Design a protein with these regions (language model features):
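Interfacial/gating helices of multi-pass transporter permease domains
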Residues: 1-7, 37, 137-142, 178-187, ...
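Helix-loop junctions and terminal segments of transmembrane helices
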Residues: 12-28, 104, 164-168, 231-241
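Interfacial transmembrane-helix starts/ends
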Residues: 32-47, 55, 78, 184, ...
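Short membrane-interface helical motifs at transmembrane helix boundaries
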Residues: 53-72
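Alpha-helical transmembrane segments of multi-pass membrane proteins
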Residues: 58, 71-95, 112, 150, ...
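Hydrophobic alpha-helical transmembrane segments
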Residues: 83, 112-164, 186, 221, ...
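Membrane-interface junctions at transmembrane-helix termini in multi-pass inner-membrane proteins
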Residues: 87-114, 127-128, 138, 159, ...
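Interhelical loop/hinge segments that connect adjacent transmembrane helices in multipass membrane
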Residues: 137-143, 155-202, 211, 216
């Protein structure tokens, strides 16, 4: 739950890098540069997502072979949910450039509509988990992955259809070393700050697990992260507006 709660924060942190460059060139009325920076940003986020997949999949065996205190009968389910969280992280990364494009174009209404719909789906998920007699952890992972996929499609499909700056066929043609380095240079500090927060929050969750704390302790910590994520989202929304 803690990892899922932080996905919204990760998205907002990553959007800043792309949105800064897109807004600058929108201000200069240089639509071609907007398209170029969007293409480079998307490819950069795709590479970062691939790198994280390799790292987290490599850690899977170590984490679930005894490092984390997980009941034997729940280990397989937890491992599958872990892979779903990795998939959600990938969707979060590659959706960031699209969301940045909406912010740069000041299309805040569409972002708000998507976020409200996302909240409704999560509310329905919570009610569904209470009603169905299924493995709640597995169902939670599957439904959250579907919700993340719907959110990604809402941003990406609309962008491809409505925005001339978003041209999938030109992504690799627009890639340039200079543009990529500028994005990496700015993204480095953003990623560093984002990584520090992720290590702090999820590190505490792992620490609670290793200290053999009761499940209620981790659950309370997860709820606290949900509140923190909501407050961060409100703050980011005000800044975007």
């Amino acid at each position: 739950a803690g990892v899922v709660a932080m996905l919204g924060f990760v998205t907002n942190a990553m959007v800043i890098t792309t949105q800064r460059h897109l807004s600058f060139y929108y201000g200069k009325k240089d639509v071609q540069k907007v398209r170029i920076y969007f293409s480079n940003s998307f490819l950069l986020h795709l590479c970062m997502a691939f790198f994280l997949v390799v790292v987290f999949v490599s850690l899977r065996g170590f984490l679930f072979s005894g490092y984390l205190e997980i009941a034997e009968e729940r280990r397989e389910i937890a491992s599958w949910v872990y892979m779903m969280v990795i998939a959600m992280l990938v969707l979060t990364f590659i959706s960031a450039p699209f969301k940045a494009l909406f912010i740069a174009k000041e299309n805040i209404w569409y972002i708000t509509a998507v976020d409200v719909f996302d909240g409704i789906l999560k509310f329905v998920l919570a009610i569904t988990l209470l009603q169905l007699n299924v493995d709640k952890l597995l169902m939670y992972g599957v439904m959250m992955l579907i919700i993340m996929l719907v959110q990604f499609l809402a941003y990406s499909v609309y962008s491809v259809i409505r925005f001339s700056e978003c041209q999938p066929t030109r992504i690799f043609k627009d890639v340039g070393k200079t543009y990529m380095l500028q994005l990496v240079n700015f993204a480095g500090w953003t990623t560093y700050g984002m990584g520090a927060v992720m290590v702090r929050t999820q590190g505490l969750s792992v620490l609670f697990n290793k200290m053999l704390c009761e499940t209620a302790v981790n659950a309370a910590y997860g709820i606290g992260l949900q509140v923190y994520s909501a407050v961060s989202f409100i703050s980011s929304s005000v800044q975007n507006a």
